[in-house]
Swiss-Prot record:
The encoding gene: VPS10
UniProt xrefs under PANTHER family: SORTILIN RELATED, SORTILIN-RELATED RECEPTOR
Keywords: Glycoprotein, Golgi apparatus, Membrane, Protein transport, Receptor, Repeat, Signal, Transmembrane, Transmembrane helix, Transport
Bias (Basic and acidic residues) ranges: 672-681
Protein's UniProt name: Vacuolar protein sorting/targeting protein 10
Protein species of origin: Colletotrichum graminicola (strain M1.001 / M2 / FGSC 10212)
All ranges on the Cytoplasmic side of the membrane: 1407-1435
Subcellular location: Golgi apparatus, trans-Golgi network membrane; Prevacuolar compartment membrane
Chief location category: Golgi
C-alpha cells in the first residue's frame, strides 16, 4: 500500500464503483437489477455499515445516491446541477460526507446523504493537493481542516482553514503559506499522550516566506490554531533531528500509530524519514548499513503497516525493471531491519505485497527469482530481461518465508502490480478465506493464463476454484463468494457464485441477454452483506456503462445457528492442533463451509479470541544492523547506544547494548523467568552509531598523492552532499587534462577519492571515457560518455557503475540535459546519420528517457539543443515541459531557419512552434530568454517566456537601438528579472556594454549600469554575491571616450540590487601599516579599491564569496584611480559585505572557504604574470583578524589550484601542485583536528552572533524594507559546524520610506530627488499596464513612483508613494476588484502578515534554478549602439517579483485501492488525458504572489562545469 499523507478509515472508502439497478428475480438465483448510464461511475463510496452508496458522474459534475445497495439511484438534488467536483467521505464518522465545488460554497451530509447542507470554506480548494483537501480529526468528527487557495488569475496563495463545528459556522483562518495541515490525532491509534494536545495540536507543512523551493519547507506545530498572542503567532518547530528542526519537509503521513515526515534537500534525491509516535519525540528512520540502502524520492513505498511497526519497500535496481527490499521497523518506527530482498515492484512504485485481513503476522509477497539477471539488465535491443516471479508467504511477520502450495505443486499468484479489480487483492474480513489468480509451476505466468485459486486456511493450502482469471468478492463473511470472468471483450453474460468456500460454483445469467466487459466488482467494506455491485461496459468507442446490483438474500431461507459454526484457528501444527502465531493463538468462529445458511449479520465484524504463548526462539529476530548467520545474529554495522551514552566517552568505554536479537514487533508472547534472548550485553563505545571521535589535537594534517601524468591541470568534479543524505563522505572525481584555448585534451585516467583526497583509486580503467557530465541537480549522479553509444553512470557517488546504450552517438557538445526534479529523466542530443541512394545525411536528434537510459523515445530531429523547462517550483509549467531549438524543416538547407519548439507531454501529442529565425535561447532562473533576428530592423530582438508557451517581445528603453551586431549575454538573474548585457562597443580589445534589467515577465527593460567591462568573448565583469540581498560587483570602463587608449577599469558595488552603484572605499593602510598613495573615505573615481573580476579568471567558478560565508568577500586588486595588472595586485577582504575593506596579504593570493565560512585558506597560486612558488598556506578562523601559516609540503612548489566543496562546508582542502621535476600531485590539508565539538545555537550559550547587512548611505539597518539578521560563528568559539547553518536567523519588516520606492517606467529622477516624466513620453496607460500584468485586478493612476519589489516594507496608505492616487479595476476584473475592496481576515493576513512582494535575493537563486551552473550565457551576435542615448539617466526598475512555487512531493502514493479515479482507470484500461479534477481542464495555476527567493547564505552550490557560452554557431552543420 502506498500512502498519500492521510489516513483513511477503510480501503473501500476511497474507491470508485457505482450502480443503478433494475431488478430481475429468479427462483433459486440472485436478484439482479441493471441500471444503464452514459458516463463511468467514479468515486463510488459505501457509507460504512450500510447499504447506502454514492458515486460521482465526473463528466456532468453530479452526485448520485442509492440507499438499497445499488438497486435504485437518484441524483442528489440538494446539490445544484454541475457543481459536484469532489466527493470526500469522512474518515472517522460513517454518516458524514462532503462534496466540494470549485468555489467557496460546498455541501455536507450527516445522515448518509439523505440531506445535504451548504457550508462556506472561505477559500476555494487547493487543487495542487489533489484529493487531500479535507483532513479529519480522529477523535472529534466536527473538527475538520480545509486546505484552500486564494487565487487571482494564475497567482495563488495557499492557505489553510479549519472548523470545530463541522462548518456550522464559516471556516476560520488557520495559517497561510501552507502545503497541507494535519491534526496530530489523524488516526484512531495515534495519540500524543495528552488529551489537550490530542484535541487541538495541528501540524502544517509550511513554505518559507522567502523561498519557493520544497527544500526550504518546514514543519510547524500549534496548539491554539496558530493564533497570535502579543502579536506573535503561537507556533513552534518540532525538534525532529535531535535538537533542531529539519528543512525540506515535503509531506506528512499518519501510518497507524505513527506519524511520518519525509524531507528532501538540494543535491540529492535521498530523503530523510522522520518518525514519531507522539509528535514530541522524533527519530530519523534508520536502515541497515550492511547493504547501503537509502530512501530515495520515488523509490520507496510505505506498505500496509501494522499497529506495532512500519513496513517499507525500497527500490534497489533500475527504475525500468525494478525490484526492492522490504524492511520492518521496531516498535517506535525508528530502526528498520531487512525482511526480504528482491521483492517485485512495478514502475509506478506498487509492490506485490498484501496482508491477510484479520490474522496477525501473515502476508504474501512476490519476489524475483532471477534477480541477478534483472539487476544486470541493460535493456540492450529494447528488450528487458523477463522477471521470473515466485510467490511467498510468511506466518511470523516476515521473519521467515515459505512457498505457496496447491497439492504438491508450487503456486504463484498475481498481486498488486497486476491489479484487476478495486479493493484488496486476495483477502477480506472473512476469517481465513483467500482468493487469488495464479498458476502452478516454477514461476508466475501471464495474467490471462491464470486460474482462480482459493484457500480457507489463510494461505497455508490452496486449491483451484475456477478456470481463467476472474474478478471476485466475498459476502456474508465468506458464506458466499462471487466472481465474474475477466475479458477484454464485451462477451460476459453471467456471474458465478459459491456457497461452500469455493468447493462448487453456480452460474446466474445477466438479464436480457446483456453481455458486458466487466470493469469492477465490489461490496460493502466489511464483506458482511449479501449484496454486490458489478460495473460493466458496452458500446465500444461510444460506451455505455451498466451498474448491476446483485442480491443473494433469497438463496438460503434460514439463518445460521450455533451448530453451523466451527472454530477456525489461524495456525495449526503438524498434528492439526492450534499453534502459536506471533506469540499467541488466534481463533475465530466461522460458518462451516457445508452449512446451508447465511449469517445475516450485516455490518458486524468478526472478533477473534486470542491466547498468549510462552516465548520461544521463533518469537525473536535479528536486531538493527545484525544479520542472520545460521542460528545466530551477526553484527553488520554500528550498534545503537542509548540516549546520552558514549557522547563524551572514550572509544574503549562500554555500555549496555543490543545482544543482536529483538522481539518481533507486535509479538505478544509471555516471557519466561531468567535470562532473555534480547537482554542487553556489554558493548564498546567504539562499536556504537556516532562513536566518539578522536579528541582534537589542534593540529592540521597534510597528505600527498602523486598522479602519474604529463598533464598539468585537472578536471575536478566535487559530489556535494544533500542535507537529507546519510552519507558522510567527501567524494571527488578527477582526471588529468590540458586546456588550450576553448579545447581540452584529457588523459584517460579517472581517479576517485571518498575522503577528500587522502586516498585515491582509479575507476573505469577498462573504459575509454570521452566526457564526464555530473548531474546538474542530483550530485550523487555522474554520467560518462564514450566515443560509441555506450554511456556509463553512477547514482551512488561513484561507488557502483552501470551503463546504457544511447540512441545516437554523442555530438560535439554536451549531449545530456537533466530535469531539476526527476533524477531519471534525461534528454540526449546526438548525431544520427542516414544513407539514402548512396548519399549520407547527418543531423542532430533529441531523445527522451524517463528511466535513466533504459528506454528512449525520439523527441525531435534537426535540433540544436533541448532543455527540460518543467520545474516543481514553477507550477505554471507542466513538469514534463521541454523546450527545443530546432530547424523549422527537417533538412540541413542553409535557408532553413531555427525555431523554438515546446511540448508539455514529451512530444507525444503536444508540439508547438514559437517564433521564427531564432538564434538561441537560455534558461535563467524562471525565465526562458530568446534571441531572434529582427528582419525589419536588421538586428536582434529579445523575447522572454515564463510558461514556455507564450513568448513576449522585450521593450528596451527609449532610444535604445539594437543593431544586428549586438551581442546579448544573459547574466546571473536571481531577483525575478532578466539581467541582460548588451554590448555597446565591439572593437576587439575595447569591448564593453550596458546592463539592462527587465520587469517581472522579462519584457520591459530599463538601465541598470553602463560601460560595463567585457572581454572579446562577451563574458562580463558582473557578479552577484551569494547569500545576501542586493549586493553585486561590476567593473566599468572609465575612459570609454578615448578609443585609442587601453581600457581604464574601475570597480563598483551595489547594495540595492543595481539601483545605485558606488566605488569601493579603500583601506587607509596596507597589511604592513603603510598608507596608500591616495585616500578617500567612501571611494571615488580618483581613489578607490579596484578588483580583478570575472573576465580575468582562468577558472570562472572562483567567486568573491561563498553563500555559506555570509558577508565575507576576498579579491585581488589595488588602491588607486583604476585597476592595475594582476602582477601588482594585493589581496583584500571584507567582513561586512563590501562596506569596508582591508589588505590581508601582499601579492595575489587565491582563497577558499571552509566550515561554512569559519575557516578561510589563502595560497599563492602561480599565473603567467606571476609564476610564484610556495610551500605555505595562510589561514584564519576568526574572520581575518589573525592569520596563521602552515607548511603543506617540505619544499616550494608551483600551486596550480586550491579546491574544496563548492558549498564551503568542508574542513578539508586540496592543493594541486607541480614540483620542479614536473611531477603533478595533490595535497589534502585537513583542519578537523582544530575542533571536536559541534557548534551550538542555544539561546544563552550560543556559539554564534547575529550580524545585519546595511546600506552604506542609510542610517539604519533597513535594507529592502526589512532588517535581516544572519548567524555567524563567534571568533573565539572553538567548534565546528556539523550541519548546514541556517544563516538567515530572522527578518523584521520596517515601515515604508522613500528608499523603498523608485521611479516608475518613463519617469526619471530630478535634481529634487522626485520622479518626473521624461520629456516626450507618456505614463504607462491602464490598458498597457493591465495587459503586461494579466493577473492584476487593479491599476493605480501613475504617481511617478513604484514600489521596489525587493522591499518588504509595511505600508499604511499614507506612506505608500505608488498608491496615493485612485485605483481602477482592470477590464473584465470589476467583480474581483469589488470583492477585494471588502477586507476580510484572510485579506488582512495577506496584506500584513505576508508583506507584499517579498523579493528574491541575490545569491542562491541562480545556483538553484539555472542547472547549477555559474557564469554567463551569450545569445546572438556582436554589435554596437549609441552610448549617449538619454536612457542612461533612467533609474533601474527593480523588478516585480514573479511567482514561483514550492512543490509538495507526496511522501508516498495512496494505497492502490484508495484512489478513486486512478483505481477505476487501472482496471478499465483508462487514463491518460488528464487535467484538474476541479477545473476539468489541464490549465494549472501556480503559487504564489508572495514567495520569492531570498539569499540566506547557505546555498553556494556551484557545479564544476562552467556556464556555457551559447553563441550563434552560424547555422551549424553536422
Amino acid at each position: 500500500m502506498r500512502l498519500r499523507g492521510k489516513t483513511v478509515a477503510s480501503w473501500r472508502i476511497l474507491l470508485s464503483v457505482l450502480t443503478l439497478a433494475a431488478a430481475v428475480q429468479a427462483k433459486d438465483e440472485p436478484t439482479i437489477k441493471v441500471t444503464t448510464i452514459k458516463h463511468p461511475p467514479l468515486n463510488l463510496n459505501y457509507f460504512e455499515d450500510s447499504n447506502t452508496v454514492l458515486y460521482q458522474d465526473i463528466s456532468e459534475r453530479n452526485l448520485y445516491r442509492s440507499e438499497d445497495a445499488g438497486i435504485t439511484w437518484d441524483r442528489v438534488k440538494d446539490i445544484p446541477d454541475n457543481q459536484a467536483s469532489l466527493l470526500t467521505m469522512h474518515s472517522f464518522d460513517k454518516n458524514r460526507a462532503y462534496v466540494l465545488t470549485q468555489g467557496t460554497e460546498h455541501f455536507k451530509t450527516t445522515d448518509r446523504g439523505k440531506s445535504w447542507q451548504k457550508f462556506s470554506s472561505g477559500a476555494p480548494p487547493n487543487i495542487f493537493m489533489g484529493g487531500d483537501i479535507l483532513h479529519f480529526h480522529a477523535g472529534d468528527p466536527d473538527r475538520v481542516i480545509f486546505n484552500g487557495a486564494d487565487c487571482i488569475g494564475i497567482f495563488c496563495d495557499l492557505i489553510t482553514l479549519y472548523t470545530t463545528d463541522n462548518f456550522k459556522s464559516k471556516a476560520k483562518f488557520l495559517r497561510g503559506n501552507t502545503e497541507g495541515c494535519y491534526w496530530a490525532k489523524s488516526s484512531d491509534l495515534f495519540t500524543t499522550g495528552k488529551d489537550d494536545l490530542d484535541k487541538q495540536r495541528i501540524l502544517c507543512v509550511v513554505r518559507d516566506n522567502f523561498s519557493p523551493f520544497k527544500e526550504d519547507n518546514r514543519l510547524l506545530a500549534s496548539d491554539n490554531y496558530f493564533q497570535k498572542v502579543d502579536n506573535k503567532v503561537q507556533e513552534f518547530e518540532p525538534d525532529m533531528d535531535t535538537n533542531h528542526g529539519v528543512q525540506g519537509v515535503v509531506s506528512l503521513a499518519v501510518v497507524k500509530k505513527y506519524l511520518m515526515v519525509a524531507t528532501s534537500s538540494l543535491n540529492t534525491d535521498e530523503m530523510g524519514l522522520f518518525v514519531t509516535d507522539d509528535t514530541i519525540k522524533w527519530h530519523r528512520a534508520m536502515f541497515p548499513t550492511s547493504h547501503g540502502h537509502k530512501v530515495n524520492q520515488g523509490a520507496y513505498t510505505v506498505l500496509e503497516s501494522t499497529n506495532y511497526s512500519i513496513q517499507i519497500d525500497v527500490m534497489n535496481t533500475r527504475p525500468s525493471n525494478p525490484t526492492g527490499v522490504m524492511f520492518t521497523s521496531n516498535s517506535n518506527g525508528t530502526f528498520f531491519t531487512e525482511n526480504l530482498e528482491h521483492t517485485n515492484r512495478n514502475t509506478n512504485g506498487h509492490v506485490d505485497f498484501e496482508k491477510i485481513t484479520g490474522v496477525q503476522g501473515i502476508f504474501m509477497v512476490n519476489v524475483v527469482q532471477n534477480w541477478e539477471e534483472v539487476e544486470k539488465d541493460t535493456n540492450r535491443g529494447g528488450k528487458h530481461v523477463q522477471k521470473e516471479i515466485v510467490s511467498k508467504i510468511t506466518f511470523d511477520d516476515g521473519r521467515t518465508f515459505h512457498d505457496l502450495k496447491s497439492g504438491g505443486d508450487q503456486l504463484h499468484l498475481h498481486s498488486v502490480t497486476d491489479l484487476d479489480n478495486v479493493g484488496r487483492v486476495f483477502s477480506s474480513p472473512a476469517p481465513g478465506l483467500v482468493l487469488a489468480i495464479g498458476n502452478k509451476g516454477k514461476s508466475l505466468g501471464k495474467f490471462g493464463d491464470g486460474d482462480v485459486y482459493v484457500s480457507d486456511d489463510a494461505g497455508v493450502t490452496w486449491k483451484k476454484a475456477l478456470d481463467g482469471p476472474h474478478k471476485y468478492e466475498f459476502g456474508d463473511l465468506g458464506s458466499i463468494l462471487v466472481a465474474v470472468k475477466d475479458s477484454h471483450k464485451e462477451d460476459i453474460g453471467e456471474i458465478r457464485y459459491s456457497l461452500d468456500h469455493g468447493e462448487s460454483w453456480k452460474t446466474a445469467p445477466l438479464p436480457d441477454d446483456l453481455k458486458i466487459k466487466p470493469e469492477l466488482l465490489t461490496t460493502t467494506q466489511d464483506s458482511t452483506s449479501l449484496k454486490f455491485l458489478l460495473v460493466g461496459k458496452t458500446g465500444g468507442d461510444n460506451p455505455k456503462f451498466h451498474i448491476i446490483a446483485l442480491d443473494f438474500e433469497g438463496l438460503h431461507e434460514r439463518t445460521c445457528k450455533e451448530d453451523d459454526f466451527e472454530d477456525w484457528h489461524a495456525r495449526l501444527d503438524e498434528n492439526g492442533k492450534p499453534s502459536c502465531l506471533m506469540g499467541h493463538k488466534q481463533t475465530y468462529r466461522r460458518r462451516k463451509k457445508t452449512a446451508d445458511c447465511f449469517l445475516n449479520q450485516e455490518f458486524k465484524d468478526p472478533v477473534p479470541v486470542t491466547e498468549d504463548c510462552e516465548c520461544t526462539d521463533a518469537d525473536f529476530e535479528c536486531d538493527y544492523n545484525f544479520i542472520r548467520d545460521g542460528d545466530n545474529c551477526k553484527k553488520a554495522g554500528p550498534i545503537i547506544a542509548p540516549d546520552n551514552v558514549c557522547k563524551n566517552a572514550r572509544p574503549d568505554d562500554t555500555f549496555k547494548g543490543s545482544s543482536g536479537w529483538r522481539k518481533i514487533p507486535g509479538n505478544t508472547c509471555k516471557r519466561k523467568s531468567g535470562d532473555q534472548k534480547d537482554d542487553p550485553v556489554e558493548r564498546k563505545c567504539s562499536e556504537a552509531v556516532n562513536a566518539p571521535a578522536a579528541p582534537a589535537d589542534g593540529k592540521i594534517k597534510a597528505v600527498q598523492h602523486v598522479f602519474k601524468t604529463d598533464f598539468k591541470d585537472f578536471e575536478k568534479i566535487y559530489l556535494e552532499r544533500g542535507e537529507s543524505s546519510t552519507e558522510v563522505d567527501e567524494t571527488i572525481i578527477v582526471r588529468p587534462v590540458e586546456y588550450s584555448g576553448n579545447s581540452m585534451r584529457a588523459d584517460n585516467q579517472i581517479w576517485r577519492t571518498k575522503d577528500h583526497g587522502k586516498n585515491w583509486e582509479r575507476i573505469l580503467q577498462d573504459e575509454d571515457v570521452r566526457g564526464i557530465y555530473p548531474h546538474s541537480f542530483f550530485k550523487d549522479v555522474v554520467f560518462f560518455t564514450t566515443d560509441s553509444k555506450k554511456v556509463l553512470y553512477t547514482i551512488d557517488r561513484a561507488e557502483h557503475f552501470h551503463s546504457f546504450e544511447a540512441p545516437t552517438k554523442p555530438g560535439s557538445g554536451n549531449p545530456l540535459s537533466f530535469h531539476p526534479d526527476k533524477k531519471d529523466w534525461l534528454i540526449w542530443v546526438g548525431e544520427k546519420c542516414e544513407k539514402v541512394n548512396g548519399k549520407e545525411t547527418c543531423f542532430t536528434e533529441a531523445s527522451i528517457s524517463r528511466d535513466r537510459g533504459d528506454n528512449w523515445k525520439t523527441a525531435m530531429r534537426y535540433v540544436q539543443k533541448c532543455e527540460f523547462t518543467g520545474h516543481s517550483a514553477y507550477r505554471y509549467r507542466d513538469l514534463r515541459q521541454i523546450v527545443c531549438l530546432a530547424h523549422k524543416e527537417e533538412n540541413n538547407e542553409k535557408d532553413n531557419p531555427k525555431v523554438i519548439v515546446s511540448s508539455n507531454d514529451f512530444f507525444d501529442e503536444d508540439k508547438t512552434f514559437h517564433q521564427d529565425r531564432v538564434k538561441n535561447f537560455a534558461l535563467m532562473a524562471e525565465f526562458i530568454v530568446v534571441a531572434a533576428e529582427d528582419q525589419e530592423k536588421q538586428g536582434l530582438r529579445a523575447l522572454a517566456s515564463l510558461d514556455g508557451v507564450s513568448y513576449a517581445e522585450a521593450h528596451f528603453p527609449v532610444n535604445f537601438k539594437v543593431s544586428h551586431q549586438n551581442a546579448y549575454t544573459v547574466l546571473d538573474s536571481s531577483t525575478h528579472a532578466v539581467n541582460l548585457f548588451v554590448a555597446t562597443e565591439t572593437a576587439e580589445g575595447r569591448r564593453y556594454g550596458s546592463i539592462i534589467k527587465s520587469n517581472s515577465n522579462g519584457t520591459s527593460y530599463v538601465m541598470s549600469a553602463q560601460a560595463v567591462n567585457c572581454n572579446d568573448q562577451y563574458y562580463v565583469d558582473f557578479e552577484k554575491i551569494p547569500g545576501l540581498e542586493g549586493v553585486a560587483l561590476i567593473n566599468t570602463v572609465a575612459n570609454r571616450d578615448k578609443r585609442n587608449e587601453p581600457k581604464k577599469v574601475q570597480t563598483q558595488i551595489s547594495h540595492n540590487d543595481g539601483s545605485q552603484w558606488a566605488f569601493l572605499p579603500p583601506p587607509k593602510a596596507d597589511v604592513d601599516g603603510k598608507s596608500y598613495s591616495c585616500s578617500s573615505t567612501e571611494g571615488d573615481e580618483k581613489c578607490a579599491l579596484h578588483l580583478h573580476h570575472y573576465t580575468e579568471r582562468s577558472d570562472k567558478r572562483k567567486t568573491f564569496s561563498a553563500a555559506t560565508a555570509v558577508g565575507l568577500m576576498f579579491g585581488n586588486g589595488n588602491v588607486g584611480s583604476s585597476l592595475s595588472s594582476l602582477k601588482e595586485a594585493d589581496t583584500f577582504m571584507t567582513t561586512d559585505a563590501g562596506i569596508t575593506w582591508k589588505n590581508v596579504k601582499k601579492g595575489a593570493w587565491t582563497w577558499q572557504y571552509g566550515d561554512q565560512g569559519s575557516i578561510v585558506v589563502l595560497v599563492q597560486r602561480a599565473s603567467r604574470e606571476n609564476p610564484v612558488k610556495t610551500k605555505m598556506i595562510s589561514y584564519t578562523t576568526d574572520e581575518g583578524k589573525t592569520w596563521k601559516d602552515f607548511a603543506f609540503t617540505d619544499k616550494e612548489v608551483t600551486v596550480l589550484d586550491i579546491s574544496t566543496l563548492r558549498s564551503g562546508a568542508s574542513r578539508n582542502f586540496l592543493i594541486w601542485c607541480k614540483d620542479d621535476g614536473g611531477e603533478t600531485f595533490s595535497v589534502n590539508v585537513d583542519f578537523t583536528g582544530l575542533a571536536d565539538r559541534p557548534c551550538k545555537s542555544d539561546e544563552g550559550s550560543s556559539d554564534y552572533y547575529l550580524w545585519s547587512p546595511k546600506h552604506p548611505s542609510q542610517p539604519d539597518n533597513c535594507l529592502f524594507g526589512h532588517v535581516s539578521q544572519y548567524l555567524r560563528k563567534k571568533d573565539d568559539a572553538n567548534c565546528y559546524n556539523d550541519a548546514r547553518v541556517q544563516h538567515l536567523y530572522q527578518v523584521e519588516n520596517c515601515t515604508c520610506t522613500r528608499a523603498d520606492y523608485e521611479c516608475d517606467y518613463n519617469y526619471e529622477l530630478g535634481t529634487d530627488k522626485q520622479c518626473k516624466l521624461v520629456p516626450g513620453t507618456s505614463p504607462i496607460s491602464a490598458e498597457q499596464w493591465c495587459k503586461e500584468n494579466p493577473d492584476a485586478v487593479e491599476y493605480y493612476e501613475p504617481t511617478g513612483f513604484r514600489r521596489i519589489p525587493l522591499t518588504t516594507c509595511i505600508g499604511n496608505g499614507h506612506n505608500e508613494l505608488d498608491k496615493q492616487s485612485k485605483a481602477h479595476p482592470c477590464a473584465g476584473k470589476e467583480d474581483e476588484f469589488e470583492r477585494r475592496r471588502r477586507t476580510s481576515g484572510i485579506a488582512i493576513f495577506f496584506a500584513v502578515v505576508i508583506p507584499f512582494g517579498l523579493a528574491g535575493a541575490i545569491g542562491w537563486w541562480v545556483y538553484r534554478n539555472w542547472n547549477g551552473k555559474i557564469g554567463q550565457i551569450r545569445l546572438g551576435e556582436s554589435s554596437s549602439l549609441d552610448n549617449d542615448a538619454p536612457w542612461v539617466k533612467y533609474p533601474v526598475i527593480a523588478l516585480s517579483a514573479v511567482v514561483a512555487v514550492a512543490a509538495a512531493l507526496p511522501l508516498v502514493a495512496s494505497a492502490l485501492w484508495r484512489r478513486a479515479t486512478s483505481a477505476y482507470e487501472s482496471v478499465s484500461g483508462g487514463g491518460g488525458g488528464g487535467g484538474s479534477w476541479l477545473s476539468g481542464r489541464g490549465n494549472r495555476r501556480f503559487t504564489t504572489r508572495d514567495s520569492f527567493a531570498r539569499g540566506r547564505g547557505d546555498y553556494a552550490v556551484v557545479d564544476d562545469d562552467e556556464g556555457e557560452l551559447l553563441g550563434d554557431d552560424s547555422d551549424e552543420e553536422v
